[in-house]
């Protein structure tokens, strides 16, 4: 009985340690507000509300453009490729929002602002495009390009993941950015995220939370099963002992 109780306690300790490690890692939320002008890239990217990259101020505290040089370079090359595909010379505004679990991309999108009110969205996990409005279908077809899709996918899934893994965990301790996010209420070309697409983003944002609950439920089921097995074993031993005593007294 004492041996089985010790075994159960040890198993519970292992499971709780695993659960604690899972919950403590959580997910990282990445967001970028970028503007592609002629030969220049402006804007910043933040993780969990803290500045990760700032292309407008190299001296900004917490800026990791040098530590994540491959990411910075890939973003600049991507901006050049997008400008080459763009019709006209207007500034191109891009917004991206994505989620990472222990540095691994689990969901998100890359949004291209087509005018003051509409955007088109690329989802790298399933390599699909969506428009915020049906009138944007022609603009979406214009941006569909295999090389562009591959470059966006590499930036979000490969280069951002490498940067997060390289800077984790100390980048989470950096002070929060004091730079204001671009004002989307003004009449500018800033990318606007529409409610119809926010639902999709919300689904990807909650994937990490769903994973955590799945782990909790599985661990709870394992613990309950182990407790039941120990209880059944103890009851069986007790029943056998009672039968032995009964047969001895009869004899």
Curated annotation (Swiss-Prot):
Residues 25-212 are extracellular. This is Histocompatibility antigen 60b. GO terms for cellular component: membrane; plasma membrane. Its main location: membrane. It comes from Mus musculus (Mouse). Residues 1-24 form the signal peptide. Ligand for the KLRK1 immunosurveillance receptor. Binding to KLRK1 stimulates cell lysis in vitro. Induction: Up-regulated in response to infection by murine cytomegalovirus.
